[in-house]
C-alpha cells in the first residue's frame, strides 16, 4: 500500500487485481448488502449501475436472494454476511485472493457449498489463492500447496505439494 518504506530489499507486486476476505465479514453497516458487494468495483472506477449489476449477479451465485441484497448487514445472519463478503471478493475477478479463515464460523453444509464456489471461481479466472486456515482438511481440500507454520518466531515447519487438482478431490 506504500504506507511503509522497506528497510532493506524491495517489494515487487505482480498482481494488479487483488481482493481480501477477512475472518469477519467486515461489511459496512451504512451500506446495503448489494452496495457492500459492489464496493471494490466502485473503488476501481466502475459506473454505479455496472457495479451493482455485477454485484447482484455474484450475490445470487453465492446464494443471496433479492431481499438479502437489499438488506442492511445487521439484518443478515452470520452465514449470509459471509456469503456477501465472499461475493465482494470474487466480483473483482481477482488475480490474487487473500483469505484469512474465511469459512471458520460456518456450518459444514454452507462451508462445503462456498468452498466449491471458491474453487470454481478461482479456476474460471485463473486466480492465485493464499488462505490462512487452522483446518487441515480444508487446506487439503482447497490447496495445491500447503505450508504449516509455527510461531515465535514464525517459520515454515512443513511443506506439502498436492499432485491432484483441488477440483478433483472429494
PLM features: residue spans?
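Conserved signature/switch motifs of ABC ATPase nucleotide-binding domains
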Residues: 92
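Hydrophobic anchor residue at the start of the ABC signature
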Residues: 86
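Catalytic Walker B motif of ABC-type/P-loop ATPase nucleotide-binding domains
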Residues: 97-101
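Short helical segment in ABC ATPase nucleotide-binding domains corresponding to the A-loop/adjacent helical element
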Residues: 34-42, 52, 56, 161
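Conserved ABC ATPase signature
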Residues: 72-76, 80
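Helical segment within the ABC ATPase nucleotide-binding domain
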Residues: 111-125
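Conserved H-loop
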Residues: 126-132
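Conserved ABC ATPase "signature" region
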Residues: 49-67, 120
Amino acid at each position: 500500500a506504500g504506507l511503509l518504506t522497506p528497510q532493506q530489499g524491495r517489494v515487487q507486486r505482480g498482481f494488479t487485481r487483488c481482493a481480501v476476505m477477512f475472518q469477519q465479514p467486515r461489511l459496512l453497516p451504512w451500506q446495503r448488502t448489494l452496495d457492500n458487494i459492489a464496493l471494490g468495483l466502485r473503488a476501481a472506477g466502475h459506473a454505479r449501475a455496472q457495479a451493482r449489476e455485477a454485484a447482484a449477479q455474484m450475490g445470487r451465485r453465492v446464494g443471496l436472494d433479492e431481499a438479502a441484497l437489499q438488506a442492511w448487514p445487521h439484518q443478515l445472519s452470520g452465514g449470509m454476511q459471509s456469503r456477501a463478503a465472499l461475493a465482494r471478493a470474487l466480483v473483482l475477478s481477482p488475480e490474487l485472493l487473500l483469505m484469512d479463515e474465511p469459512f471458520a464460523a460456518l456450518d459444514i453444509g454452507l462451508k462445503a457449498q462456498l468452498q466449491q464456489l471458491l474453487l470454481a471461481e478461482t479456476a474460471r479466472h485463473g486466480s492465485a489463492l493464499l488462505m490462512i486456515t487452522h483446518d487441515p482438511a480444508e487446506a487439503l481440500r482447497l490447496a495445491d500447496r500447503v505450508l504449516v507454520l509455527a510461531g515465535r518466531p514464525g517459520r515454515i515447519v512443513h511443506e506439502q505439494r498436492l499432485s491432484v487438482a483441488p477440483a478433483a478431490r472429494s
